[in-house]
A protein has these predicted regions:
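Terminal low-complexity/charged segments
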Residues: 1-206
C-alpha cells in the first residue's frame, strides 16, 4: 500500500474512503467529491509525497446502472518515482460535476475536456470547458456512456448542413455524405443545391 494513503487519512479523516492495491501494484484511493481539490493540492504540495505530474484523467461507467460513474486521476511523483490513483464516485442521480484541477496541473485542461465530451461530467472552474473530440455543436449525448447506442447517434441532415455551410460551392456525392435516405429531411434550398451537384445522383421521388 502506498504510504501516502495513511498520511491522507491522518490529514483528511473521513474524506478519504477505501483504498486497495491493483493487480499492477498501484494503490487506488477513493476520495469524496467535495474534498477532492484539497486532497489533490495536498498530494502535489506536501513534502515527502509531491505528486507533481498528472498522468491522466479518465472516467468509467459500469453496466450496473446502480453503480456510480467513477473519475480516476493518475498521479506520479517524478522525484520519488511513485504512482497513486485517486478515484471519485459520482452517483448518476446527482449532478455529474466536480471541481477542476487545472489550477493544480495545467495538463488537466484537455484531459477534463475529453471526460466532459465523452461522459458529460462538468468540471467547475475549468477555463474552457467544451467538447474536444466531437464537434462543438454535437448534441446527441456522450459517446462513452452506456446508454449511447453502439451504432452511434447523429443526424445525417445536420451532417450535410454543416458540410455545405462550410463550403457551399463544393459538390458532394451521396457516397461522401451518406444522406440518401435522409434527403427528404433537407430544406428545399439544400435539396436544390444538391440536385445541381456534378458528382453523384440523388434518388428522390418528386
Amino acid at each position: 500500500m502506498n504510504p501516502s494513503v495513511d498520511a491522507l487519512r491522518a490529514t483528511f479523516g473521513n474524506a478519504i474512503g477505501r483504498a486497495l492495491v491493483a493487480r499492477d501494484g498501484e494503490t487506488i484511493v477513493t476520495v469524496g467529491r467535495d474534498g477532492l481539490l484539497g486532497v489533490m493540492r495536498w498530494l502535489r504540495d506536501t513534502a515527502g509525497h509531491s505528486y507533481d505530474y498528472l498522468v491522466d484523467v479518465t472516467a468509467v461507467e459500469y453496466r450496473d446502472a446502480e453503480r456510480p460513474i467513477e473519475l480516476v486521476y493518475f498521479l506520479r511523483s517524478l522525484e520519488r518515482r511513485a504512482d497513486l490513483r485517486v478515484k471519485v464516485e459520482l452517483p448518476k442521480e446527482q449532478e455529474l460535476a466536480l471541481d477542476s484541477v487545472v489550477g493544480l496541473w495545467a495538463g488537466a485542461d484537455w484531459l477534463e475536456r475529453e471526460v466532459y465530451d465523452m461522459f458529460g461530467v462538468t468540471f467547475r472552474g475549468h477555463p474552457d470547458l467544451r467538447r474536444i473530440l466531437m464537434w462543438e455543436t454535437y448534441a446527441e449525448g456522450y459517446p462513452l456512456r452506456k446508454d449511447f447506442p453502439l451504432r452511434g447517434r447523429f443526424s445525417r441532415a445536420e451532417q450535410v448542413r454543416q458540410a455545405l455551410g462550410a463550403n457551399p460551392e463544393a459538390h458532394y456525392s451521396m457516397e461522401e455524405l451518406s444522406i440518401a435516405e435522409a434527403f427528404a429531411e433537407l430544406p428545399e434550398d439544400m435539396k436544390q443545391r444538391l440536385r445541381q451537384g456534378e458528382r453523384g445522383k440523388i434518388p428522390f421521388s418528386e
